[in-house]
Amino acid sequence: MAESSQGRGAVLAAWIGLILGPLLLLACILTDPPGGLSEKAWLTVGLAALMAVWWSTEAIPIPATSLLPILLIPLLDIDTLAKATAPYANPTIFLFLGGFLLGLAMQRWNLHKRIALATLLAVGNQPSRQIAGFMIATAFISMWVSNTATSIMMLPIGLSVIGLLIAGSEEKEGARFAVALLLGIAYSASVGGIATLIGTPPNALLAAFMRENYDVQIGFGQWMLLGLPLSVGMLIFIWWSLTRGGFRLAGGDSRGLLEKEMAALGPMSRAEKMVAVVFVLAAAAWIFQPLLADYID
């Protein structure tokens, strides 16, 4: 019943947004701009309001809303079609696209899961080490894959380990371990995104803003020189905060579970190996792009 009610609410919100968005744009078309604003700026406000309403209510698919400027900017005589379409070919967009495609390929062939399991098997069985392993694996994957996708991938592995490690522990200790591990996954997914330009969209947006407005070029490697140490430092601090204060569990051994999960993946397929090669080459190209720029140009 609750799900049905939520579904009806979403449909109602979409219908309201579908009507409200164009009305806001129409209001800007029919009214004079307030003091200090040009007519084109006022129409841009109306377009922004339309898009904000449609995005927030999902009146139409979100990607379709993102294409409205291509249609409405020249139609409303705000600017030319060439100016309206130029941002869609911004280098930052292609950086996002490359990162997303790489992340999808890793997820398609389970390369990210293999990396995570290998990391967890390497750190040992102590609870504090397991938390460190989860945080390292999550942060590393989040450097290249979206924070949300990384968290979703790591969560079932974490829950399985929690169930295994707390089986022979006291209830209070088990609960503390569970909370620390789940918080570690959540925090490290966000912290890992700081380390690279493609880790999270605001990073690349900042680089694009600095390039376009201040003529300051921030390369992939330059970002990592600052972002990676900051990310590592934050990971260490978070791990220390989560595991200090007598955090210990009496028993539990997750190695068997992790080895079973790794065995279930089987040997690396040809496609997975190719994705790994592309991943290494892409990461190297992003990092060393300033050194290669003279030869490419």
Region locations from a protein language model:
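Alpha-helix capping and helix-loop boundary segments enriched in small/acidic/polar residues
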Residues: 37-41, 59, 88, 106, ...
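Membrane-core helix-loop-helix motifs of multi-pass transport proteins
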Residues: 165-248, 263
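Charged, alpha-helix-enriched surfaces in structured cytosolic catalytic cores
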Residues: 44, 110, 131, 149, ...
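Hydrophobic transmembrane alpha-helices of multi-pass small-molecule transporters
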Residues: 1-95, 212-214, 222-297
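Alpha-helical scaffold segments in soluble metabolic enzymes
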Residues: 160, 205, 209, 279, ...
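Membrane-embedded alpha-helical segments and adjacent helix-loop junctions characteristic
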Residues: 6, 33, 50, 63-172, ...
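Transmembrane alpha-helix interface/packing and boundary motifs in multi-pass membrane proteins
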Residues: 52-61, 137-146, 186-198
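Gly/Ser/Thr-rich helix-start
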Residues: 22, 59, 104, 147, ...
